[in-house]
Amino acid sequence: MAKQLSVSALRVLHAVAGGTHYGFDVIDLTALPGGTVYPALSRLERDGFLSSSWESVTVARAEGRPPRRYYGVTEQGLRTLNDALRTLHALRPIRTARLSPVKSRS
């Protein structure tokens, strides 16, 4: 059975699926707070949906900042994201359907 992801985790996964990003990029892309994004990145990586790598210390030093950890989506993450998006799109008509009033039987 596929792992159920929270809406926040799906937003993070979707943001990273657009290319390799570091944590603050994901915060900007999702408009989620860091206290949500960084734990989600950690869980998504632990569960095999993301992979990460550290940038070169040389590059970071040249720019006068600490090294960034870059995240990319895995094949498993892409499959999970696409499955979740298909499910959400299938549910959209149900969520947005107008319900007509029901008349009393009495």
Labelled PLM ranges:
Residues 37-49:
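Basic amphipathic alpha-helical segments that dock to polyanions
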Residues 47-64:
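Beta-hairpin "wing" of winged helix-turn-helix
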Residues 2-38:
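N-terminal helix-turn-helix DNA-binding core of bacterial DNA-binding proteins
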Residues 2, 75-106:
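Amphipathic alpha-helical dimerization/coiled-coil segments
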Residues 67:
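Exposed loop/turn and edge beta-strand positions of beta-sandwich/beta-sheet ligand-binding modules
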